[in-house]
């Protein structure tokens, strides 16, 4: 068994990576909305926060009724209770990664969790 997983992602509207990468601590999806498109529902989560990384394009998130403009390179974190919906700009598609993890579950990270090989 290998210590890594690698896949390539097509330009599909949504690709969930938990099964294809064997994820055990997070859900990651890659999402594409055409110009003028939107996620067709408002949602929030029971326990998971979401981190959205805008890979290309422009659009907005509506979080608890507030418009948040988004463009390439922006990153937005939304708490579990935040009611959210995503929209592409009328003249631009948008592509983004969504990382979903249980809020409050991060026990160690980066240098605190790394074991440096000699």
Spans of features found by a protein language model:
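Short acidic-glycine-tyrosine-enriched beta hairpin
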Residues: 65-81
């Amino acid at each position: 068994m290998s210590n890594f997983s690698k896949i390539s992602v097509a330009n599909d509207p949504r690709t969930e990576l938990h099964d294809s990468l064997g994820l055990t601590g997070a859900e990651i999806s890659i999402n594409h909305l055409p110009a003028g498109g939107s996620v067709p529902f408002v949602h929030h989560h029971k326990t998971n926060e979401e981190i959205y990384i805008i890979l290309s394009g422009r659009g907005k998130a509506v979080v608890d009724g507030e418009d948040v403009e988004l463009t390439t390179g922006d990153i937005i974190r939304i708490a579990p209770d935040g009611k959210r919906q995503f929209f592409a700009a009328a003249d631009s598609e948008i592509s983004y990664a969504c990382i979903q993890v249980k809020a409050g579950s991060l026990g160690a990270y980066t240098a605190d969790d790394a074991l440096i090989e000699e």
